């Protein structure tokens, strides 16, 4: 229900074109995805903590968004929110960051309280996405990031119905992009760059569609050769309970925020639909 845009580059760049002036830029997409926006930018891609900007307002009406488009880096993790769980607050706005790690998500995992475990960092907000990120960080093995992401996908599939598990994750060295569910994901390689996006931003370029259950690994030190692999396999994908969750689809702005906050409260109280 959200929009994600990621990029890696051999040299520091800005993605101002993709954010503002491309044929289908994020600022235009934000007219329908108006529950907030955020971006984590890694300037050097050497495992440093990213520079994070995020606001719980629509990007198209927020001057901070235009100012943020000039940020330069080698890894970008950008997100437009269309709230389904959790109100319009800063703590519910993606990407979520913990140290050098950043995470943004497109989809709804309706029984997300099942991701809460003793010993894991408590969420600051009410979103399913932050619960996913905190569970991942609780179980993360920095020596085996793809294995850790596989465990997250397996956990979500086994514990809840969902519309999408599409996510962007970065450890400050690489960008990982995963697709599973009803929402699309696309990728593009340019000289010295690679991008991944929920929507095709520049239709005149050679975008490719990411298939179900494919994890892409984009390396800023080798951006023109992204790696792709299946993550959980056919058996678990077949067992996944994928649902559109169409309630509240017509809502926008504050009305959507109120709906998402009330829905999260119901789920947290144990009355997940």
Predicted segments, located by residue:
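Cytosolic regulatory regions built on CNB/CRP/Popeye-like sensor folds
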Residues: 48-56, 100, 111-121, 273
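Short histidine
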Residues: 110-171
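Conserved catalytic micro-motifs used in adenylation/nucleotidyl-transfer and phosphoryl/amide-
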Residues: 2, 92-110, 154-216
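Short acidic (Asp/Glu) patches
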Residues: 55-67, 78-99, 115-117
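Short, compositionally biased leader-like segments
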Residues: 8-10, 42-44, 49-78, 132-135, ...
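Short helix/loop capping segments that flank catalytic or ligand/cofactor-binding pockets
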Residues: 15-16, 50-52, 86-88, 105, ...
């Amino acid at each position: 229900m959200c929009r994600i845009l990621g990029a890696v580059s051999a040299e520091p760049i800005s993605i101002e074109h993709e954010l503002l002036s491309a044929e289908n830029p994020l600022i235009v997409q934000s007219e329908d995805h108006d529950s907030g926006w955020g971006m984590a930018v890694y300037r050097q891609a050497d495992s440093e903590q990213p520079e994070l900007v995020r606001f719980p307002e629509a990007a198209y009406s927020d001057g901070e968004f235009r100012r943020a488009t000039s940020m330069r880096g080698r890894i970008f993790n950008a997100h437009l929110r269309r709230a389904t769980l959790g109100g319009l607050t800063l703590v519910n706005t993606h990407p979520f960051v913990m140290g050098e790690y950043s995470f943004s998500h497109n989809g709804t995992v309706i029984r997300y309280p099942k991701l809460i475990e003793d010993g894991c960092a408590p969420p600051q907000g009410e979103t399913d996405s932050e619960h996913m990120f905190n569970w991942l960080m609780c179980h993360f093995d920095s020596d085996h990031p793809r294995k850790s992401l596989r465990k997250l996908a397996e956990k979500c599939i086994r514990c809840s119905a969902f519309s999408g598990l599409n996510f962007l994750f970065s450890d400050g060295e690489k960008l990982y992009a995963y697709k599973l569910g009803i929402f699309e994901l696309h990728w593009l390689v340019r000289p010295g760059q690679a991008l991944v996006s929920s929507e095709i931003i520049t239709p005149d370029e050679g975008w490719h569609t990411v298939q179900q259950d494919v994890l892409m690994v984009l390396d800023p030190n080798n951006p023109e050769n992204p790696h792709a692999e299946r993550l959980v396999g056919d058996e678990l994908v077949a067992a996944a309970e994928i649902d559109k969750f169409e309630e509240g689809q017509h809502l926008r702005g504050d009305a959507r925020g109120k709906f998402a906050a009330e829905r999260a409260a119901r789920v947290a109280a144990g009355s997940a639909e």
